[in-house]
Amino acid sequence: MFKSGFVAILGRPNVGKSTFLNHVMGQKIAIMSDKAQTTRNKIMGIYTTETEQIVFIDTPGIHKPKTALGDFMVESAYSTLREVETVLFMVPADEKRGKGDDMIIERLKAAKIPVILVINKIDKVHPDQLLAQIDDFRSQMEFKEVVPISALEGNNVPTLIKLLTDNLEEGFQYFPEDQITDHPERFLVSEMIREKVLHLTQQEVPHSVAVVVESMKRDEETDKVHIRATIMVERDSQKGIIIGKQGAMLKKIGKMARRDIELMLGDKVYLETWVKVKKNWRDKKLDLADFGYNEKEY
């Protein structure tokens, strides 16, 4: 008997949702950084064994939106509640429950689907603090289970996976066993470039960046995958920061991104990056759609 099911990973920004998904999948399919709102699109991670398939849906961190892009991200996250049988509500062990958590809890109560509370980053707290955190969240709503984990170190992750597989119902294998995500390579390439911008820049720059892969094809002469990508920003000052003195920052972004892209593709890569200004793109629906943030996603 084959079992399958869809599981959403929900929570505030920076609680470790993407770190968890990458750990489960055994490779990077969702980019990570210490900046809030790193994940902007829903990303499927397809976990398949001989007897079961769990389709995880990593979602953007739920926050109070200030732009049309923010609206898109929050609606995209909540839309998964219509697509799944179980929700992993992830919270950090080293932070107290806040208004953002309470807002999510109200939506989860209304959704009326099983919710597992996943308390991440247990490596950062004393066990007594963890018990207080569990009691506090349990006072707010009824959870199917509570599972403390460290996504970074992998502590207790197998326990969570076993809990999910034990509760799967008989179903189809929705995706081939060798498919690990629903997104095409172009999307993953653009995300890997954006991740390097997030790591290397500060303040408003990371939130103002989108990456569009203009072309991606193999050059038969050099046997390399030739990629042309444009980094979009909202202001000339941001363009200057990303290019850097004599192009040094852009070169660094390209070099770091190329390494990750080569690992993913298993091929040598020639990466060309450009920077363009598109004023206030985060508040323009047409620009959002052009850059891959399309309302059709929810």
UniProtKB/Swiss-Prot annotation:
Region ranges (G2): 37-41
Domain KH type-2: 201-279
Domain Era-type G positions: 3-170
Cellular location(s): Cytoplasm; Cell membrane
Renumbered residue ranges of the record's region G3: 58-61
GO MF annotation list: GTP binding; GTPase activity; ribosomal small subunit binding; small ribosomal subunit rRNA binding
Membrane topology: Peripheral membrane protein
Key words of the record: Cell membrane, Cytoplasm, GTP-binding, Membrane, Nucleotide-binding, Ribosome biogenesis, RNA-binding, rRNA-binding
Pfam families cross-referenced by the UniProt entry: KH_2, MMR_HSR1
Positions of region (G4): 120-123
Binding site for GTP: 11-18, 58-62, 120-123
A GO BP annotation: ribosomal small subunit assembly
Stretch list, region G1: 11-18
Annotated region described as G5, given as residue ranges: 149-151
PROSITE patterns reported in the protein's UniProt record: G_ERA, KH_TYPE_2
Cellular compartments per GO CC: cytosol; plasma membrane
PANTHER family: GTPASE ERA, GTPASE ERA, MITOCHONDRIAL
Function, as annotated: An essential GTPase that binds both GDP and GTP, with rapid nucleotide exchange. Plays a role in 16S rRNA processing and 30S ribosomal subunit biogenesis and possibly also in cell cycle regulation and energy metabolism.
Subunit architecture: Monomer.
Family label: Belongs to the TRAFAC class TrmE-Era-EngA-EngB-Septin-like GTPase superfamily. Era GTPase family.
NCBIfam families (alphabetical): era, PRK00089.1, small_GTP
Name this protein carries in UniProt: GTPase Era
